[in-house]
């Protein structure tokens, strides 16, 4: 056999040449394949631009191009990243923190295929015998509850919130968002020929009311066109009520909250299944009971089943359930709706899909996989990342936690700063070399926040009594006012249930979370924070013109792109294309608006500035006050005109905090504010939290980061475990007392962090 090396063996590195996506500064870097590579650097240094925006994006674009144009029309349109060359790419699988599904029919069980395996087990060995397996699916007509149609809940719709009985259809009697006069839905009702469009609804007969509200889907013909007519209530249920509430448009969500009352389905008691499916048992349990069990309990139940005829299936199901437990999700149940998962939980559920995969030589791309994980769970996550690597895969991880950086085979550090000051490779190599380097990450890798010895004295308390949301066990606890309180515990211990389920009801509480900021692609930090108002006023005064000229959403908008900066072209069966507007060249404004300047800059140039640059430009007034708040929360690198849709969860939370900081004497509730923060940024966050407390505010933080725990005045630790094993307060007191006296999981890891 020849000893000559195979030519294919030379392709063992991903080669990036001349990457310029976003703030990347002509980056050249080689990344070893079949290794675990961790990308570090400040928030905004260019990590995601390199990993997601360049490497993963190009891999997915090349794969998508192998499909027919018909198939591509149903896939997202991906442009080629701004890079000179990318070599030796393998197929990329992105495991990010985007929430899963906008549909109530998607659950943890359906997302991981555990529900499908469980259905087959029940169809094969259940008593009485019932086949096929679709009989046990709430998404199948054979298995769904006839009352709630497989949703597990019923709805009562207030008819008077749907229509105005004093008007006719032509006068706009239907008051549902999207059904106004002239809309497509309105035209279907008016031109169907089934209703008198000029007759007041108050004068409708019982038959006409039935046709308007309840008629099942019916084919109607208008001229030469045929279309489907459906009663208003079934149409609303189908188009609105099956969606995740958080994914609804603002007007639709407000309408649903106003017009619809939801309740657990009385017929299936929330199980979603019909009586036949609920009658079948395996080892004394129905499939509904199994789906409602905690995953760790279900894993133990499945392991005890002795059914040789379905042993391979039980092994596969057991492996999936054990994987969920290993990623710290043992407290979930298979019937938990996917849309209710946090970003970190959603990412770990996606990860489980790939752990049992037969694929090899794939590139897995992770975005902060430790988000939402207690230090106790991070070690288990690290083992899973290493197991993916050991199957011959390339694992690329964007991460800030030292525990995960420590297991890397290869580290790529970007910086030296954020935004325009970032985008350069400051270090590549192993972890030991990073620790010895003089980069910001290297200097902070072993940095430890000192334990707060002298805690601040509270000015009062907010009492929570009898809290029993989700897994809480009738918890009574006092939240001290005027200090920094950190609520800790493993994932699923009840932290969010305690804080979010009890505190928002109190007056003066400001909840600053990581949920998506609602708005269009035109929304940006300048519009969201109100910064654009003083900027427009300054331009108007300097040029003696109307302030409305300097809005890309009204008078000042480019007529070609309507102020969007891009023109969207529909290519029928092929994917639509967004191209930079030729008239305004992406600047969004009319030429005559851009002719007006403020200290030598036009409005588009100001909106292109980062927060840091804008602080130097606006040295006083309301604009400077808002910019200072954005800088204080660590968003100095953000561009004023950057679309809000591009922000991460951590960035969204800090943007909301910047808006809320103007309030005095408030109680701020923050959910994992260290998400997305570099080790150096954590120090800045702690200084900000201290300033809020010193200004008379109260800060309550749900957090896993040991640096925040050590810096707290008061700690409330929940546990001792997750799910049924959690829901109790296992410690209350100062960080020093936690380290000295407690034996909780949090105490052990905080002691290890402090080297005690």
Residue ranges and their predicted role:
Residues 1-756:
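Conserved phosphate-binding elements of NTP-dependent enzyme cores
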């Amino acid at each position: 056999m020849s000893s000559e090396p195979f030519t294919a063996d030379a392709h063992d590195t991903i080669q990036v040449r001349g990457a310029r996506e976003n703030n990347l500064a002509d980056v050249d870097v080689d990344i070893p394949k079949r290794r675990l590579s961790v990308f570090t650097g400040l928030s905004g240094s260019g990590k995601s631009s390199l990993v997601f925006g360049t490497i993963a994006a190009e891999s997915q674009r090349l794969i998508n191009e192998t499909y027919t144009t018909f198939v591509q029309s149903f896939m997202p349109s991906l442009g080629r990243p701004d890079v000179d060359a990318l070599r030796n790419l393998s197929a990329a699988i992105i495991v990010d923190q985007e929430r899963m599904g906008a549909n109530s029919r998607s659950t943890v069980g359906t997302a991981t295929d555990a529900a499908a395996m469980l259905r087959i087990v029940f169809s094969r060995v259940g008593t009485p015998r019932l086949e096929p397996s679709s009989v046990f699916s709430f998404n199948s007509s054979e298995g769904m509850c006839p009352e709630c149609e497989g949703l597990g809940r019923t709805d009562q719709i207030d008819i008077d919130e749907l229509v105005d009985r004093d008007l006719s259809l032509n006068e706009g009697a239907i008051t549902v968002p999207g059904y106004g006069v002239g809309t497509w839905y309105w035209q279907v009702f008016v031109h169907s020929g089934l209703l008198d469009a000029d007759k007041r609804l108050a004068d409708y007969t019982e038959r006409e009311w039935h046709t308007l509200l309840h008629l099942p889907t019916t084919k109607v013909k208008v001229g030469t066109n045929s279309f489907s007519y459906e009663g208003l209530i079934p149409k609303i249920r189908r188009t609105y009520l099956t969606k995740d509430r958080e994914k609804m448009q603002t007007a639709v969500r407000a309408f649903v909250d106003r017009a619809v009352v939801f309740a657990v389905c009385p017929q299936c008691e929330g199980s979603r299944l019909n009586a036949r499916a609920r009658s079948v048992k395996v080892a004394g349990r129905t499939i509904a009971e199994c789906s409602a069990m905690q995953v760790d309990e279900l894993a133990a139940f499945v392991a005890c089943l002795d059914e040789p005829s379905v042993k391979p299936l039980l092994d596969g199901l057991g492996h999936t359930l054990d994987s969920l437990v290993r990623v710290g999700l043992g407290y979930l149940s298979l019937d938990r709706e996917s849309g209710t998962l946090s970003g970190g939980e959603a990412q770990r559920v996606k990860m489980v899909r790939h752990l049992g995969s037969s694929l090899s030589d794939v590139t897995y791309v992770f975005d902060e996989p430790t988000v939402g994980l207690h230090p106790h769970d991070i070690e288990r996550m690290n083992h899973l990342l290493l197991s993916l690597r050991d199957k011959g895969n390339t694992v690329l991880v964007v991460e800030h936690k030292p525990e995960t950086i420590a297991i890397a085979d290869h580290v790529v550090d970007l910086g030296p700063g954020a935004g325009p000051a970032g985008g350069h490779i400051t270090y590549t190599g192993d972890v030991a070399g990073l620790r010895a380097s003089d980069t910001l990450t290297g200097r902070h890798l072993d940095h430890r926040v000192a334990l707060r010895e002298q805690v601040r004295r509270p000015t009062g308390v907010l009492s929570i009594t009898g809290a029993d949301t989700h897994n809480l066990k009738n918890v009574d606890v006092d939240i001290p006012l005027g200090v920094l309180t950190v609520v800790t515990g493993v994932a699923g211990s009840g932290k969010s249930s305690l804080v979010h389920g009890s505190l928002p009801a109190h007056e003066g509480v400001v909840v600053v979370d990581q949920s998506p900021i609602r708005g269009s692609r035109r929304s940006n930090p300048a519009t969201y924070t109100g910064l654009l108002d003083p900027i427009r006023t300054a331009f108007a005064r300097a040029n003696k013109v109307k302030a409305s000229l300097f809005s890309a959403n009204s008078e000042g908008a480019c007529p070609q792109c309507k102020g969007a900066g891009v023109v969207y072209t529909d290519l029928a069966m092929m994917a639509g294309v967004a191209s930079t507007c030729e008239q305004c060249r992406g600047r969004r404004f009319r030429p005559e608006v851009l002719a007006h300047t403020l200290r030598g800059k036009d409005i588009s140039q100001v909106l292109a500035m980062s927060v840091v640059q804008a602080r130097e430009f606006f040295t006083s007034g309301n604009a400077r006050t808002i910019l200072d708040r954005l800088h204080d929360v660590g968003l100095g690198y953000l561009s004023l005109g950057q679309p809000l849709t591009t922000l991460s969860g951590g960035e969204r939370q800090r943007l909301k905090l910047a808006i809320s900081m103007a309030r005095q004497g408030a109680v701020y509730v923050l959910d994992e504010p260290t998400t997305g923060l570099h080790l150096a940024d954590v120090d800045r966050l702690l200084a900000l939290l201290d300033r809020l407390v010193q200004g008379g505010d109260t800060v309550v933080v749900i957090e896993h980061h040991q640096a925040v725990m050590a810096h707290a005045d008061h700690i409330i630790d929940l546990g001792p475990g997750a799910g049924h094993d959690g829901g109790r307060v296992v410690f209350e007191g100062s960080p020093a007392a936690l380290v000295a006296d407690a034996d909780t999981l949090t105490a052990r890891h905080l002691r290890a962090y402090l080297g005690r």
